[in-house]
Amino acid sequence: MKDYVRIKIASPQQVLSWTERSLPDGRLIGRLTNFDMLHFETKKPVFGGLLCERIFGSTKTNQCFCGKYKKMFQKGYANNFVLVCANCFVEINNCNRRRFRMGYIDLVFPLIHTWYLKSRPCYLAIMLGKKVKNIKKMCFMDSYIKIRNNDGQTVGILTGAEAIYSRLSKIDLESLIEFLYKRLVGIEKLKEYNFEKYLWLRKKFINRIKLVNAFIQTNTKPIWIMIHFLPVLPPDIRPVVKLQDGTVIMTDLNFLYIDIIYGNNKIIKLRKFLLPEEFMLNEKRSLQVKVDAFINNENISENPYEQNDKKLKSITEGLKGKKGRFRENLLGKTVDYSGRSVIVVEPKLLLHECGMPLDIALELFHPILIKMLIRFKFSVGIREAKRHIYNASNFVIPVLEKVLNSYFILLNRAPTLHRLGIQSFQPKVTFEKAILLHPLVCSAFNADFDGDQMGIHIPLSLKSLAEARSMLISINNCVLPANGLPSILPSQDMVLGCYYVTLENCNLDFILTNLKIYANIEKVKSAYHKGEILIQTFVWLICQKFPNILKNSKIRIKKKRMVKKLVFFRTTIGRIFFDDMIKEFL
């Protein structure tokens, strides 16, 4: 069983396997040919349209389009076989199938995917070995390529997506990578007399080799980056709603699909009139713009698909960002045994500890607490234990602390861009509403204390508990997996705090007149706690063990009238505290 997800380019046959299916009589359905959605009189879905019941399934459970099988399944017939109406060819089944069944638009010619053209780096230009501006000129039909026969004579020209498709179809990946390796070895001669050009060519060839290797390893053909069949999302994901006043509203994706189907059908009709290809260049360019607007509507400067001075929401906008499908619905979904709260700093915690609010702890560890209360004879049954937990009795918190002492929880901060975005900590009960976090682990989470929130997850199985205790614990994740640099770094406020603690008050009044002399460190700390000195006040401390400190130097003590000369050190109480913390850490 594979425990990973791999994303790669889908072939046209793979897209057809997603979107096309066959009826019991052998008829293939799935292709959308009609840009109409609802019949203007009956308000029912049009066959071959964006809401077609033949392609996506019936709109009502166990009922076909014409109503022939309306009462059949209400009488208790078994629904363990595929039944298709002989009149309307609609499958009689559950209407929930309209949530996952897809259709497709058979494009007249392969179109360019805007992600591979307008992204950085431009993978289309890298694969073809051309400049980005030249590729864009050809895509927007500002340049062309000539088609020659075996005799070298020009028999036609190609431009736009058809020219790109012609170039990609002629690429042999095995021969291309062998050629690139030879060129990479051949440019070594440039290193001696033109080093800058050598570096530029070397980077260019290495990037192209990496891309070609990725295509070879995933068994992907270069022509697959062109769009042959455009998938159409299920109708329930792009709903059409009818209001009480008869107004029909629908999502922006439906408008974009309508434009694509209309432009595609228009080119098909023009070809039936046997018009020269030169007369259809404008329609081809228009169809390319419509598909680009469907995929990503932001990069189109002059957008003809605007409603109320607002661009239509493309499929890319529905996927990316904080409110996109991934972060909002897939990665950020609510799961059982989890909580969420704001994080605040608590430097008194250990590196592997975190503060957990009492309300969250009582709710997440509710079943375990019930079991422990019954085991320790605090409660007779489950109902009594729940009442004690709800009232937060005096003996509940000690039992909860005993449970948390041997338990580890997972803290996650979205977005989880690398594996350090989720780590395990030993929880400590706090009577606040926020999660307490050690400031040193914030750099791994990319978190700060300006309102960031973190999620709490409880591992349940023994395997997950062992993994949280050994692998995910914060003290075992001190380096970044990408480059090996330390992930536990002091933040700016910690550096400023160390600077403030070790700062000296250079006022001459403190240095020369108000001399504070103490016999040992304990008396200095006692004076600070009594409020006699400040944290940056100079103090003079008698050095009683100076031979151990100045081991390699000779100190001469002169006796004059039996008076012993002492050695003093000038320091501050802040430096004494800082030195104690360093010694305790070491």
From Swiss-Prot:
Residues engaged in binding Zn(2+): 64, 66, 85, 88
Catalytic activity: RNA(n) + a ribonucleoside 5'-triphosphate = RNA(n+1) + diphosphate
Pfam families associated with the record: RNA_pol_Rpb1_1, RNA_pol_Rpb1_2, RNA_pol_Rpb1_3
EC number: 2.7.7.6
MF terms (GO), sorted A to Z: DNA binding; DNA-directed RNA polymerase activity; metal ion binding
Record's keyword annotation contains Transport: no
Predominant place of localization: plastid
UniProt remark on cofactor binding: Binds 1 Mg(2+) ion per subunit.
Cofactors, names only: Mg(2+); Zn(2+)
Sorted UniProt keywords: Chloroplast, DNA-directed RNA polymerase, Magnesium, Metal-binding, Nucleotidyltransferase, Plastid, Transcription, Transferase, Zinc
Record localization: Plastid, Chloroplast
Residues the entry annotates as binding Mg(2+): 448, 450, 452
One cellular component (GO) term of this entry: DNA-directed RNA polymerase complex
Single GO BP term: DNA-templated transcription
Function: DNA-dependent RNA polymerase catalyzes the transcription of DNA into RNA using the four ribonucleoside triphosphates as substrates.
Similarity field: Belongs to the RNA polymerase beta' chain family. RpoC1 subfamily.
Name of the protein in its database record: DNA-directed RNA polymerase subunit beta'
